[in-house]
Amino acid sequence: MKTHSDRKSGLHPRNRHQAPYDFDALCQRTPELQPFVFVNEHGTQTLDFADPAAVKALNKALLALHYGIAHWDLPAGYLCPPIPGRVDYLHRVADLLAESAGKVPTGKGVRVLDIGVGANCIYPLLGAREYGWRFVGSDIDPVSVKAATLLAKSNGLGSQIECRLQGKAGDIFQGIVAQRERFALTLCNPPFHASLAEASKGTERKLRNLGKEATAKPVLNFGGQKAELWCEGGEAAFLASMITQSKAFASQCLWFSSLVSKKENLPAAKQGLSRIGARQVRVLEMAQGNKISRVLAWSFQDEAASRQWWSPMAHDNA
């Protein structure tokens, strides 16, 4: 029997999700996925991607089968991320680190900060499993911090993933990064929308694309709390704030990075980076089928200093 969709074009070569989903293997590993799988009119196994319960069950199965993450769940109403795209971000920035390290750096000596870790803890879980990296995940929502901490511990990664509560709205690095703490990389999936109404419209658009009728009060089909989905000024404002605040931590992080969903937000972000004196700026394109997104990465170290970052002497005070 055929499985869902064609090959997912555009994914990173190391991405485990190049091929169509193997629903037989996924259901064998995670039987709770089985009720959501059906054969469509083309004779292809698939599921209803507009159904939050189906998407959540698929995520649990993918994480268990491909990454050995046996325990994964979410509090009701929290963001349920698409696994192939999230892990693609990690592979792209791993290659970026490899440019100065000489090879893709692995192991607990590579410290990564995930800004807005969310209740799903997805980047730390995937990064710890794929590359052995050590993570700090920050979030302004206490429920997310508690849930992410539980996920790390329940998968035997409690010593590798630490979640910290950001106590001050508006601060991104301050209050999270300690004075002498160093990170090879920061990650962020910033709030996309400028308001709840805009987030709801985005869900209606997704449902139309999936051939579904939008309800009078649309359910956010991938879930999401306020801090996960929207902020004042949307993605552009959050990105501008992150760029400005990163300057104060220029010597403590090799590469800062963020997903940028809206291409039109790039020019202003690049101008902001130029103003604060970023030495290196990169845009890493990502594609999954027809969906195009990108990672904006910047560093206050030049190429020579970036190579020096990985020398043992550079980590004496880490």
UniProtKB/Swiss-Prot annotation:
Keywords: Cytoplasm, Methyltransferase, rRNA processing, S-adenosyl-L-methionine, Transferase
Lipid metabolism recorded as keyword: no
Primary location recorded for the protein, binned into one broad class: cytoplasm
Top-rank taxon, per record: Bacteria
EC number of this enzyme: 2.1.1.181
Reactions this protein catalyses: adenosine(1618) in 23S rRNA + S-adenosyl-L-methionine = N(6)-methyladenosine(1618) in 23S rRNA + S-adenosyl-L-homocysteine + H(+)
Methyltransferase keyword on record: yes
Subcellular location: Cytoplasm
Pfam hit, one: Methyltransf_10
Record GO cellular component, one term: cytoplasm
Enzyme type, top EC level: transferase
UniProt GO molecular function: 23S rRNA (adenine(1618)-N(6))-methyltransferase activity
GO biological process: rRNA base methylation
Family: Belongs to the methyltransferase superfamily. METTL16/RlmF family.
Record function comment: Specifically methylates the adenine in position 1618 of 23S rRNA.
UniProt protein name: Ribosomal RNA large subunit methyltransferase F
Species name: Aeromonas hydrophila subsp. hydrophila (strain ATCC 7966 / DSM 30187 / BCRC 13018 / CCUG 14551 / JCM 1027 / KCTC 2358 / NCIMB 9240 / NCTC 8049)
The encoding gene: rlmF
